């Protein structure tokens, strides 16, 4: 992780290090020991833990499920047990994460 005026997330996939602007990241999804950083045009897969990623990216992201960490600015709306991203993708929201997710989305809307 790396912070500058233009905040970015640095991840390593194999021998390659990628600098991904925070504003381009839609969400992170974990599957076992692998985490995928998903942008509009690409997925970057690396080994890690979602809890570690959450600590590194900070308050712009909220945990919506055991496997998903979403950038609040990428969310269009919350419907039932899902969030709908601005590009139409739907991600599950666990019942235990709904209150904190709703609060984070509301805060992002008020501050944005």
For the regions a language model picked out, list residue spans one by one.
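C-terminal output/interaction extensions
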Residues: 100-112
């Amino acid at each position: 992780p790396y912070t500058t005026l233009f905040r970015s997330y640095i991840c390593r996939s194999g021998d390659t290090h990628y600098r991904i602007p925070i504003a381009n990241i839609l969400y992170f999804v974990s599957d076992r020991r692998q985490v995928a950083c998903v942008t509009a045009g690409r997925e970057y897969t690396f080994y890690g833990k979602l809890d570690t990623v959450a600590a590194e990216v900070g308050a712009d992201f909220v945990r919506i499920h055991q496997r998903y960490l979403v950038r609040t600015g990428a969310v269009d709306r919350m419907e039932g047990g899902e969030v709908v991203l601005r590009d139409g993708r739907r991600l599950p929201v666990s019942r235990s994460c709904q209150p904190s997710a709703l609060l984070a989305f509301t805060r992002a809307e008020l501050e944005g």
